[in-house]
């Protein structure tokens, strides 16, 4: 539904990073959030992978001194990439998607997003503990742990088809 309000953490839950303690898994979850239907919502601190257990620990103060010292620049840049991808690629906001099951590995999640003009993107998440040889090609829009052919363990690939 296009009016869903999607979030992965909030003032009522443990923070996303607390569930994984792994940036690659963290960004896999955010890639899903920014490519599925609905409105993605980011809780303050998620852009820097802030940790925090259940309430009240999830309501820690924003670490402004760390941000001002540019300690989190790479994380902020990754979040900006995902936000800009969602903003600039209409297909990311489309309601239409399917799971082609094109990979034998059960821990490889692949879905194809389509829009009304026929544009397509593929979202590929390697949740296994083995590298995956990526099939086909396309313009890479967002990637982590991807070398152009192999999607590494806990890797993420979003590409135009």
Segments predicted by a language model, with ranges:
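Carbohydrate-interacting/catalytic domains
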Residues: 26-27, 37-42, 46-161
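Alpha-amylase-like alpha-glycosidases and glucanotransferases acting on alpha-linked glucans and related
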Residues: 1-37, 48
